[in-house]
Amino acid sequence: YYDFLSLKTNVSESRKEKARWALVIGDVMGKGIPAGLLMTMLRGMLRAEVLTGLPPDRILHDLNQLAINDLDQSHRFVTLFYSDFDPRTKKLRYSNAAHNPPLLWKNAEQKIIKLDTEGFVLGLQKDAQYNCCEIKLQDNDLILYYTDGVIDSSNALGERFDEDKLIKVLSKLCKQSYSSQEILNKIFKKLDDFTGQNRHLEDDASIVVFQLR
């Protein structure tokens, strides 16, 4: 699951004003219709919660409070990474509920850092607390959001396309100044080549690429 949400809550605001955006990626434990229904429910809760304008850590805290009974009854949990970006200040705030940390390519420094912060999965602990971090982005910085289906994919020898492999592939592509769409396509091509064209991914593999221009 991934989503993009406009955080402009005042309908009278000028259309020319740049609104903040929320970028979210998450994964529910399990597969099939029950997991899909839970994620749909959570998506609705999240879309209502973001309109409060609260910081990411409070968003995750409140979302956990809202969803914990349904998740507990289904014996499932959810990992979720929530971030919001302000194009006026170029600042990204983020909070993590035990999801795979997105990879940030810092173009000026030619290196990748992980956007990680402590936080418990949604649905297991009612009083779970979350941290909020903030980072300022620069032009041509790029963030790769992904689900664990990417790095848990394996080839015929049982080798995993792990986080280290993903970082190496992303770093090489970013250094060649590809567009965000080209990077997305080439990563999936690398994944197909690694697992074999006829092999099915063991879990859903979702990737979102956000590039600042």
Predicted segments with their positions:
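DG-centered beta-turn motif at the end of beta-strands
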Residues: 27, 99, 147-149, 204
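Acidic loop->beta-strand submotif enriched in PP2C/PPM serine/threonine phosphatases
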Residues: 2-6, 10-18, 78, 113, ...
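Catalytic core of PPM/PP2C metal-dependent serine/threonine phosphatase domains
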Residues: 33-110, 116, 130, 195-202, ...
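Active-site-proximal, acidic helix/loop segment immediately C-terminal to a metal-coordinating Asp/Glu
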Residues: 33-53, 113, 137-198, 202
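Amphipathic alpha-helical coiled-coil segments that mediate homodimerization
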Residues: 1, 59-66, 183, 187
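Flexible loop/N-cap segments at domain edges
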Residues: 20, 24
